[in-house]
């Protein structure tokens, strides 16, 4: 806490830490008004995440404890949380304890991706396009063209090891 102001007989003397009343010949009132230091916690994101208690600036008083929680949108993941310029890793919440200075917290997200690996059991018998590993964003769509070589036919297609028939 700090001295916000000193009031002597209804007159604000300002934020002083000492004064003297000389030649006292009447009653006096002295009021000292204290205030708590205030600090700002600034939170930022690159999007696709809800930050609680609030995204942006939060004012807290000296010694406060403040818990932040992060809830990502569907198909997004937290890739880092940065507090005062230092990574604290991939966390779903962070607590500031005994706040005595301004603070920053940033939540970094990215879209979730998946890898689809497409192969054929015998390359001489036909092909699948695109072949190999393909990266697809969450909730995305990937189409494949399957063609049998001359003299062959498609007997079965497996997706994650499960038959979907001769498509």
Predicted regions and their residues:
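Surface-exposed interfaces of beta-sheet-rich extracellular modules
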Residues: 1-20, 65-95, 141-167
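Extracellular/surface recognition and adhesion modules
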Residues: 6, 32, 41-43, 49-51, ...
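Short, solvent-exposed loop/edge segments of extracellular or virion-exposed proteins
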Residues: 12-14, 40-59, 87-89, 117-136, ...
């Amino acid at each position: 806490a700090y001295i916000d102001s000193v009031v002597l007989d209804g007159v604000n003397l300002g934020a002083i830490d000492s004064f003297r009343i000389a030649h006292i010949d009447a009653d006096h009132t002295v009021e000292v008004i204290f205030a708590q230091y205030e600090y700002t916690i600034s939170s930022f994101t690159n999007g696709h995440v809800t930050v609680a208690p609030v995204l942006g600036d939060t004012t807290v008083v000296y010694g406060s404890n403040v818990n932040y929680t992060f809830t990502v949108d569907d198909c997004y993941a937290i890739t880092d949380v940065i507090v005062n310029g230092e990574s604290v890793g991939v966390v779903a919440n962070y607590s500031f304890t005994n706040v005595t200075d301004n603070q920053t917290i940033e939540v970094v997200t990215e879209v979730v991706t998946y890898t689809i690996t497409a192969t054929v059991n015998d390359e001489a018998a036909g092909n699948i396009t695109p072949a190999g590993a393909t990266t697809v964003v969450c909730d995305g769509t990937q189409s494949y063209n399957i063609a049998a070589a001359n003299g062959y036919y498609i007997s079965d297609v497996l997706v994650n090891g499960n038959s979907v028939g001769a498509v």
